[in-house]
Amino acid sequence: MRHIVLTHLDFDHAGGLEDFPEATIHVLRAEAEEAEVRQGFIHRRRYRPEQWDGVRDWRFYDPSGEAWFGFNSVRDLDGVPPEILMVPLPGHTMGHAGIAIDTPEGWLLNAGDAYFHRHEMDEEPSCTPGLLAYQRMMEENRAMRLRNQERLRALANDGSSDVRIFCSHDPVELEALQRLSTGWRPLAAGSSRHAQYA
């Protein structure tokens, strides 16, 4: 393992980094700074420095770069193939990012914790009460989080785009991606890339 690209440094995303001592860890600078300061009750619980104390090679990025499907400041990463891009998606944390991967079948966008449930990407979004409460409790900036959800939702429902969006915590989306990796192709021409998660 030479490179690990993180959406953010919450404990459930950064666990195990020390198991890859030779890897370069890529993250937005704002995320690294918040994780280092750990100011406030939530930050002291969400960021656990013991998970990355042994990491020797970090790459920090400021939001800058090109436009990509309606998102700004999208950039490539040092030493990583150009098919992998970092997409700033602040809100859940101020340094939260999505990771876009250009594949022969189209783009994959790991939206991390920008949303938690597949139905949040529906044209008429919904979320289970528990997940909604957790998102609100953990958010750094509600307006930014909701704005990024709106932009992700618009992209997910744009039948002309070739972007498949998924989050970090929805098991149905995970199963769909696992089927995709085995060659399963459920979509008809012109259908939403998100429809397969219904």
Where on the chain are the PLM-derived regions?
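Active-site metal-binding motif and surrounding structural segment of the metallo-beta-lactamase
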Residues: 1-27
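Active-site metal-binding loops of divalent metal-dependent hydrolases
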Residues: 9, 31, 91-93, 112-114, ...
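Short, well-ordered alpha-helical microsegments
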Residues: 12-14, 94-97, 174
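Catalytic core of the metallo-beta-lactamase
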Residues: 22, 42, 60-122
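Metallo-beta-lactamase
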Residues: 29-88, 137-160, 190
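Cap/insert and terminal regions of metallo-dependent hydrolase folds
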Residues: 105-198
